[in-house]
Design a protein with these regions (language model features):
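P-loop NTPase motor domains
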Residues: 1-244
Length: 244
């Protein structure tokens, strides 16, 4: 393989997809001896992973919307063809509302996917009572009073256009999509951040995404990580180094 020899030259920064942890084992120690910071998203041995919290890389509303779109794409099985895109669009609106709300309203320690899952629990729907107001409805009503132009509120209203039974199906579908974030090991990874993606182009570092070769259950995290890593590099080049 040409990957390991290239890395062992230690002449640039690296972002490496590493099935079964073989590349990290062969090159990580060498890079560390040569002054590199090593960051690892480890989906083979979850307990050994560094933290990765996608919320840490949201600078504005556009970033939040990108995160949701990337999450939806990364958690949709490849080759699947929807007969009705309504459900995915409805899930997207709900997730945009919740993630924007946390990004704009919540303290930093609550900006993570564990809190997204908790917020989903507040979105109760009673099929027999279309007038029922859930705890999450009350929260968004309070936000609307303070900030009538809130994009989070607008997206929540899109979700609320659905009737009771349909809303319940949207909630279930969203919760199933995000089910991995209920696992303690994934929660431990995504509740904090060690990746420091904005420094990828600033100092010697290597980022390894260690993935199993026989299970893709959590690979969506790698997709999110790569998308945000490249966004961070573009931001650093354009805004900090002014395109240099």
């Amino acid at each position: 393989s040409y990957v390991k020899p290239n890395i062992l030259e230690a002449n640039t920064n690296y972002v490496v997809t590493d099935p079964k942890q073989e590349v990290l084992t062969a090159t990580g120690g060498w890079l560390k001896q040569n002054g590199y910071e090593i960051r690892v998203l480890n989906l083979v041995n979850l307990e050994q992973s560094d933290g990765y919290n996608p919320f840490r890389y949201l600078r504005d509303e556009k970033d939040a919307l990108k995160l949701v779109n990337n999450l939806i794409q990364a958690t949709t099985p490849k080759g699947s063809h929807e007969s009705d895109p309504f459900w995915t669009k409805a899930e997207t609106a709900l997730l945009q509302a919740i993630i924007l709300m946390l990004f704009q309203e919540a303290p930093e320690y609550e900006q993570n996917f564990s809190m997204v899952m908790r917020v989903l629990e507040y979105a109760e729907v009673k099929e027999e009572d279309e007038e029922y107001i859930s705890p999450l409805d009350l929260l968004f009503q309070a936000i609307e009073q303070d900030r009538p132009d809130s994009v989070a509120v607008r997206q929540y209203k899109v979700f609320k256009m659905a009737a009771g039974k349909t809303s319940k199906s949207i909630l279930v579908s969203t919760a199933v999509r995000l089910a991995p974030f209920n696992l303690p090991q994934i929660k431990a990874i995504t509740d904090h951040d060690d990746m420091d993606l904005y420094t990828l182009g600033e100092k010697k570092c290597a980022l390894y995404a260690v993935i199993p070769d026989n299970d893709t259950s959590f690979n969506f995290l790698v997709s999110l990580l790569y998308a945000q890593a490249f966004q961070a590099l573009y931001y650093s080049a354009d805004q900090i180094h002014h395109g240099a």
